[in-house]
Amino acid sequence: MSNKRVVITGIGVVSPAGRKLDVFFDNVTSGKGFLKGIDRFDASGYPSKHAGIIEHLDAEEAFSMRMLKKLDRFSHIALLAADDAINDSGIDIKSEDKERIGIILGNALGGWAFAEEELRDLHRLGVREVSPYQATAWFPAAPQGQISINYGIKGFGKTIISDIASSHLAIDYAARAIKSGRADVVLAGGTEAPVSPYALLCCNTSGELSLTGSYKPFDRSRDGYVIGEGSAVLMVEEMERAKKRGARIYAEITGFGHTSDGTSPTGHDPEGKGIARAMKVAIDGAGIKPDDIHYILPAATGGINSDEGEARALGSLFGERLNASASIGVPKTLFGNLLGASGAVDAAIACLAMARGMAPVTMGCDDPDTRWKWSKEYGVAVFREIENVMINSIGRGGVNASLVLGRV
């Protein structure tokens, strides 16, 4: 692997908390909540029936209805986020060598809304009434493929399916593709649209969703997370190339750690040894010390064991210095856990936090567990200089990922 430095030069976010970056960041620092009862279909029989929902997607304003009707909502959302990331980066895709542009996206569930409708038609009306676009609309690689088709991208491509860690790994693969010389620029991120009957059922059967509709990680009465739909896509680029074209640089991708618990298909290690190793690998890879981390966006899935394990991992790595050296925030409590897109959304928040000197923290935690000593920062946005950010993901199957971004 070369010593090339890799940076983020464009951001696109489509979320329940907004799409335009200024609006999105203002919302996640204001404490405004975007979780609501699901009314897209009858969710009354589900144990968990709340979500972060994008009220007005308006994909037809940017893309033709002829194309959109062939795609699932998770592709619609990803197309918008990718378009925003490209525009934000200032890169003219048409003038680039498209064989040197990559695209790597993650998701956890695929396009279930489209698939469910076609399965209902199959059951009620028969095989002849199923959409001919079924085969290309639902499968997990559809957003990656459609974005590459839309912009003529012909370089390195990959779709990552690794539960909540999916977009974390997409960002890492993007950085590796650039360091290894396989691409000059890469669109990297994730997308998810889990607010459909079967997708919601799958999430409910995991046992990880909040039954109260409250997403309150590290709270004494935490009972899981609330899902959300959305996408975040980052333009990832080699640093010298970015500087040469006068690009705005949000952050450098400096470290990444990826481990497995090897313990349970659905549960999480309450000791947190796997995520602790991932964090250490990421920090060591960045060439810094734990004290140099100023802002932490934990996985914070709100489960009894998952939060316990992550809290122990943070304590083992940072010790008593944690509260003094770093702010800890879980802004996704406002708009939901975007599953396979959550890591990329957190990375977008981290970039904006470094640029603005403001760290969004955690809302909705009314009774923080006092065993963990960062409770003083719940419910407020912290103004501070931020040089390095650490972002964690913990997925089902014991997948752990930690990413470190540094200010340039």
What is the predicted function of each stretch?
Residues 16, 109, 163, 303, ...:
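Glycine-rich phosphate/pyrophosphate-binding beta-alpha loops
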Residues 1-67, 89, 240-252, 348-363, ...:
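ACP-dependent fatty acid/polyketide chain-elongation machinery
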Residues 124-131, 169-172, 176, 192-245, ...:
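Glycine-/small-residue-rich "gating" segment that lines the acyl/pantetheine channel
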Residues 5-9, 32-36, 213-288, 294-295:
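Condensing-enzyme catalytic core mediating Claisen C-C bond formation in acyl metabolism
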